[in-house]
């Protein structure tokens, strides 16, 4: 991949889309991970630091302190306006108001947290006449590895054309701190959660697989070239198929 070309195209994309919408800037959720770090960095290059608001939304009992420290350090490095909003009280109030939430499984509860964060981002975007820019990468989008109307509820996905491995490469090129690049990716929706444990395969391998699937490579060849198991390949293809609805607008019946 031509990293310079990718960088320039993403910067132009942010400028063009925000200009077309006539907004004053963007709001981005900063988790302390590499995807949001790269997104915020590119937004600053596109619009300038004064038009980028970073919001960190930890859950006090769950979010590792290092994530909050890394999020704040990134905002300081970029020189952007930055706020921290603890979502614990909001989640607790929801749980108290909806008794059934106590017995909900951890995925349902995790999705609630992602949608709470989306609502906070849009509150500030609406208040300030800005757009919400997402931090999803191509790997996550193809797999449907995100919450519908949560972290998937955004106006723009600037790094949505970059595989996860491409996110690491472009981040390194831009001088984003190595500690963020090498940190284990996690959505932070429950204790001990990591992306690669959820997926059952490393990002390096899953990116190889996704590229081959897009190129129409036969399953037997994918298994031979990547060295992954048939179960891992089936898991990837099932995710793509099962989560197709996330990549489409809600269906509407044809009446005329």
Swiss-Prot record:
CDD domains assigned to the protein according to its UniProt record, in alphabetical order: NAD_synthase
InterPro entries, alphabetized: NAD/GMP_synthase, NAD_synthase, NH(3)-dep_NAD(+)_synth, Rossmann-like_a/b/a_fold
Substrates-to-products reaction catalysed: deamido-NAD(+) + NH4(+) + ATP = AMP + diphosphate + NAD(+) + H(+)
UniProt keyword annotation of Magnesium present: yes
Superkingdom of the source species: Archaea
Pfam family, one: NAD_synthase
GO terms for MF: ATP binding; glutaminase activity; metal ion binding; NAD+ synthase (glutamine-hydrolyzing) activity; NAD+ synthase activity
GO cellular component, one term: cytoplasm
Pathway where this protein functions: Cofactor biosynthesis; NAD(+) biosynthesis; NAD(+) from deamido-NAD(+) (ammonia route): step 1/1
SUPFAM superfamilies associated with the record: Adenine nucleotide alpha hydrolases-like
UniProt keywords, alphabetically: ATP-binding, Ligase, Magnesium, Metal-binding, NAD, Nucleotide-binding
Annotated residues for binding of Mg(2+): 35, 140
Enzyme type, top EC level: ligase
Protein EC: 6.3.1.5
Keyword Secreted: no
GO process annotations (BP): NAD biosynthetic process
Binding site for deamido-NAD(+): 115, 148, 155, 245-246
Function, in words: Catalyzes the ATP-dependent amidation of deamido-NAD to form NAD. Uses ammonia as a nitrogen source.
Subunit structure as annotated in this protein's UniProt entry: Homodimer.
Family (UniProt): Belongs to the NAD synthetase family.
Protein name (Swiss-Prot/TrEMBL): NH(3)-dependent NAD(+) synthetase
